[in-house]
Amino acid sequence: MKNNRLPLIVGAFISIALIVAIFVVYNYKNNQVNSASDEQSKTTETNKTTEQDSTAIEKPDNTETPAKPEQQPDENGYLPNQTLPTEPTYINGILLANKIYPLPSTFAPEENPEAREALNQMLAAAKQQGFDLVAFSGYRSFEYQTTLYDNYVKRDGQAAADRYSARPGYSEHQTGLAFDIGERGKEDVWLTEAFGETPAGQWLFAHAQEYGFILRFPQNKEEITGYMYESWHYRYVGKEIAKEITKKNITLEEYLGVK
């Protein structure tokens, strides 16, 4: 009788062992799936946060057209006794920095990565055409612009300096979107109108719009921009806007409706 029960007992133990094994495997797999699901959820949330941050940077809240100043600019184009703002001025998502709409002294965005990438593409295209262009000046801090401007004033006087150099807080270079460009090997025409007459300068003027850049201070527009013609100073605004500004032969101020 005992011998007849032994196979039954062994079989029962084997069945129980199989059930336990199946339960353990199932539980392990289920935990793996849940962990993967949780990780995916975290990744998705991280991506959403990154996208929201990017959108916030590209489309700041203060994008409405600013109120026109009540005062009239002085002989150098600046508003008398103007204090620097606490927030930068954006119009339709475009950052503006000029003699009327300055930047906060604490505004320090560093160089804009999108502008740098577009610049690199433009310089590479120029090199394929035989022009070795280089951006010899880009982002500047408030402190550096202060030193630069003060040196120009000491050398040339304030009235002369105000025609070609921005006061600290008013410089496009502080936006991280502007670059001074010249041709290697022809440094003698850097920062001169003559650069615009060279084949390299003419190529740059003709093709900058294709990469999202505009000549920021064009000829015969000093009364609008506040600065003399600068054949070397280019500002990134994006391809669509750059093409429209170039086609219409207008300045950024005219495009934004602040002149």
Task: Label every PLM stretch briefly.
Residues 2-259:
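Extracytoplasmic cell-surface/polysaccharide-interacting catalytic and binding patches
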